Every structure is written in C-alpha cells, then in structure tokens.
C-alpha cells in the first residue's frame, strides 16, 4: 500500500457509487483514498431493534450523518386530485398549505451512504428506458445501451449476493441471479391473488438481502428493519460489500468525517487537489491524480458549483434534476395479513414499467407490496394512522384491526424539466462558509398524469385483493420526499448539453470523473437505482487511467 501522500485516485463519497468505484480500482491494482463527509456506522451498536421506540423511529442519526439542504418554494397545487392527496384516517391531511410540501432530502452521510438506510431493492433498468429521446422524444438517451452495462450488473450482483427470480421480462440476463428469491410473505401472496385476478404478473422482488449465506455474511432473518439499518450485515449496503472488499485488497484507505469543500484545478486539463475541512476549522489539501466524485445528485453539483463552477462549461451542472414519483396506499383487509412479517417490499409487478406502458403518458412505473415503504412498523404507528377516535372505542378498534393492513406502492418515471434543478443557496451556508445546495423540484402535467395512473392501479390492486377500507394514501403530488434523485451532471456524447462523457469523465478535465446518479440521463420507470449506480461505477473504474 502506498503512503497517505501517494495514491492513484481520490474518491469523494463512500456510498453507492464511490464504494463500487473504489472496489473496481483496487481490483485493478490501483491505490485509493476514499473520503466521506459522514461517520462510520457500527451495525451492532448503531442499529438496535429492541428499543421502546423501534416502531416509530427512522434511521439513526450520528454526528455528521445528516447534511443540510434548502428548498426553493414549493409548487402551487392546482385543481382537485382526490386520489393524490396525502393523508391518513387517524392524522388527517398531510398538506394544507396549498403548495407542495418539501419535506426533506432523505440522504445518509457516512461510510456506506444511503445504502445504509435503503430497503435493499436491486433492479436493472429497462433497456428501452435508456433510449428515451430517440424512441420517445423526451429526456435524453444514455450514450450506450443495456448490453454495454449488463456485464457490470452481473459483477455487482455477484459481489452483493442479490436474490431474485429467474425471469424479469425485458431485463435479459447473461446468467441467473446469484441467489434464489426470498419466499413471499402472507401479505404479498394475498396481493398476488389480486394481481392474478387483474391479469397482472406478480413476482418476487430482486433484493440485495441474502436468501442464503454469502461470502461470509449470514442470510436474512426477516426482522423487517431494513430501513433502520441492518444489524446482521445480510442487507447488501455498500459498507459490508464494496467497501469491505476494497479494504480487503490492502489498497484502499477510508477516511470518514472528511467533508470536501472545494476542488482545485490546474492550468492545463487536470484537476490537482481537493480541500478537506476539519471540525477545528483547519483545511487540508489532498492531491488527486484522479478525482472521482460520488456525492449523489444533490451534493456533487454543489461541490462543482462551489468550486467556481468547475466542469460547468455546458451550463448543465445542477440542471435536469429528477426525483422519482411515488404513491403509497394503505387499506384494511377483513382477514389478518401480518403485513410486517417477511421481507419488506418482497413482491413486484413490472407490467407498466416500459416507457410506453401507461396510456397517454411517456414514462413507466412499477407496483409493489409496500410493506417497507409504508414505515408502519408496529402498533404505535397503526394506532395513530389507521384508526380514528379516542378512548376505549379507539383502543378496541386498534385491537380488532391490528395486523389487517395491506399497502400497495407505485414508483414511476420522473422526466427532467428546466424548473427542477440543484443550485447554490445565496443565503444559507455550512460551518465552513460553503453555500448549501438548494433543491427546486417541479411536476409537469405528464408527471401528474403518471401519478394518477399509479394511484388508480394501486387502489385497484388492493380492491382485487379483498381490501375494503383505505385508511391512508401518500403521493408525490403534494409531497416531495426524495425517493430517488438523479440527473444533475448528465452523461452524453455532446459536451454542449452534458457534463461527463460515456465513460463518466468530464468533457473538460481529463482526470475528473463522476460515479453517482447525477450522471443518469433518465430515471427509469421506477427501478431502484443502486444497482445501476454500482454497475456504472464499476464500468467507469475499468476505464480510469487507461489512456493518460
């Protein structure tokens, strides 16, 4: 291993993309310094599932694990959308202001990034979703096709230990998933009968959670705590997969709590260093022979813009921001469903995932058993959200109905528009004086049309499955929840309308690369993006340094 002052590449961000890039470079014999603004998490210590608030708390916070962002004013809500209004029977309407609620940016800073918090869905993109401009006239094409990415999907799935079914429609595979699919939960089987009645294909969701022991990690025990952190290491978060594998090579140094404030550029065509801030206010300069940015679609453009607009010759840094659309509908079933048993989000329908699968709009969606996304983990949340009233009658209703809930979710395509972007807040700064990211997120009419379809299909599936009373519904129409974000440093062949080329390298700076979802030209039809980010990062890591 080279000394701390001598490495081949510096990677900023130890989450989905940065971890995979580090592993890919180390596999090639290169030495890597992997920086992250956040802390390390210890699964045994930091992810307790036995505390009294286990069913109401979110992913645990540690010092430095939550970044700060600001939001532009929310979009005004126009018209009446009864299927899209967010709220519950117990708590009432979520939004009453008349404008879209910009709740938060769901992002974890730390070694492993937001994969520490994610449910663990592991999806490949629909091949047609990579050709949105040439085939459907919207968004932009990826500068390569699915066949180019497929070997890197395989490499990522193999390291993670993805468990999935033998067939996933248009997503052809050169070989099967590494592990067999997880058994479907009781609730998923109930929804499966409803799907069959509607003529829909309902199958096991492909998951980055082990169905069998894999590479020294244990199989999932179905505790249901994926979003609160996996204490066993069976969920395929980046810390226990790619970071661990990179460290095992002896060629990777990991430095948590190291926020990068600025990038220094040289006179020619290379960046030279990054500046890292320390809690005492001192600034450290770290040389970077190759610099890979993997901070995500919000923080990567912030870093570039805060570095005097580095890599923004096209004016596209921060533009084309996309946040996938989401609908979650909860209903009560006459029979107990034990909705929190089994693997969260364990079943899925891809029938409407192709870009032209939804009548009247371009851009697809997927429908799934939203047992994890609903965050209805225990009795406390159920009593608050599913049952109205007070006193003894309320308690009796909770006792009678607990365990009878079903949730169906839909996640759909987000198309870029010029009103959705990430820029620098002119007034708000972090402790080092760096402007915060400011998110502007806007829905156009096609997004709202897609949401209407998603909400209607979710309710249709619940009804076909025997559910009789809807008690809550949430949608992106009135609520920005940052489900998955993409697109602010788009890749493409034309340097006038993109930030990086097909390899992930910036058009202007030969040693500046990006390996996160900011490079996505399109979002896909509701696929979870982590596996595609892994694959892209492995592909980019294969190219770094080969033509210097």
Give residue ranges: language-model regions:
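A glycine-rich dinucleotide-binding beta-alpha-beta segment and adjacent secondary-structure elements
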Residues: 92, 204-211, 219-226, 256, ...
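Short phosphate-binding/catalytic loops that engage adenosine nucleotides
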Residues: 30, 200, 467
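FAD cofactor-binding and catalytic pocket of flavoenzymes
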Residues: 85-114, 118, 142-146, 314-437, ...
């Amino acid at each position: 291993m080279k000394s701390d002052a001598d490495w081949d590449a510096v990677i900023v961000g130890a989450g989905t993309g940065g971890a995979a890039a580090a592993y890919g470079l180390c596999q090639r014999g290169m030495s890597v310094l992997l920086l992250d603004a956040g802390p390390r998490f210890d699964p045994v210590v930091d992810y307790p599932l036995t505390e009294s608030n286990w069913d109401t708390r979110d992913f645990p916070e540690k010092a430095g694990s939550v970044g700060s962002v600001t939001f532009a004013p929310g979009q005004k809500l126009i018209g009446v959308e009864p299927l899209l209004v967010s709220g519950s029977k117990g708590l009432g309407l979520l939004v009453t202001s008349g404008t879209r609620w910009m709740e938060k940016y769901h992002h974890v800073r730390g070694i492993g990034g937001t994969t520490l918090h994610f449910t663990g869905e592991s999806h490949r993109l629909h091949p047609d979703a990579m050709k949105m401009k040439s085939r459907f006239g919207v968004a932009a094409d990826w500068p390569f096709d699915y066949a180019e990415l497929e070997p890197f999907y395989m490499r990522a799935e193999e390291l993670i230990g993805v468990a999935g079914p033998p067939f996933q429609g248009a997503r052809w595979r050169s070989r099967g998933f590494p592990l067999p699919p997880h058994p479907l939960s009781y609730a998923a089987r109930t929804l499966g009968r409803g799907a069959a009645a509607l003529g829909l294909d309902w199958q096991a969701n492909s998951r980055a959670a082990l169905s069998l022991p894999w590479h020294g990690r244990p199989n999932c025990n179905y505790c249901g705590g994926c979003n609160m952190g996996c204490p066993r290491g069976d969920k395929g978060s980046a810390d226990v997969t790619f970071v661990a594998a990179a460290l095992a090579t002896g060629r990777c140094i990991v430095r948590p709590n190291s926020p990068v404030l600025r990038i220094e550029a040289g006179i020619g065509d290379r960046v030279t260093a990054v500046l890292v801030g320390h809690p005492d206010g001192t600034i450290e300069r770290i040389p970077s022979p190759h610099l890979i940015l993997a901070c995500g679609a919000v923080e990567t453009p912030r870093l570039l813009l805060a570095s005097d607009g580095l890599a923004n010759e096209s004016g596209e840094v921060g533009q084309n921001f996309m946040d996938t659309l989401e609908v979650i509908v909860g209903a009560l079933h006459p029979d107990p469903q034990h909705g929190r048993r089994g693997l969260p989000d364990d079943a899925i329908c891809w029938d409407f995932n192709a870009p032209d699968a939804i009548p009247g709009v371009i851009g697809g969606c997927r429908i799934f058993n939203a047992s994890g996304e609903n965050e209805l983990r225990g009795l406390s949340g159920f009593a608050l959200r599913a049952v109205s009233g007070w006193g003894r009658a309320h308690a009796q209703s909770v006792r009678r109905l607990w365990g009878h809930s079903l949730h169906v979710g839909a996640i759909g395509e987000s198309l870029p528009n010029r009103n959705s972007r990430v820029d620098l807040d002119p007034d708000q700064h972090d402790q080092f004086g760096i402007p915060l990211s400011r998110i502007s997120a806007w829905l156009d009419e096609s997004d709202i049309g897609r949401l209407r379809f998603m909400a209607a299909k979710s309710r249709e599936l619940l009804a076909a499955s025997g559910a009789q009373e809807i008690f809550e519904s949430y949608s992106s129409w009135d609520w920005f929840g940052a489900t998955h974000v993409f697109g602010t440093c788009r890749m493409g062949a034309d340097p006038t309308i993109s930030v990086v080329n097909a390899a992930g390298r910036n058009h202007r700076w030969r040693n500046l690369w990006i390996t996160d979802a900011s490079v996505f030209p399109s979002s896909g039809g509701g696929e979870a993006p982590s596996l595609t980010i892994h694959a892209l990062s492995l592909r980019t890591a294969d190219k770094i340094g080969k033509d210097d």
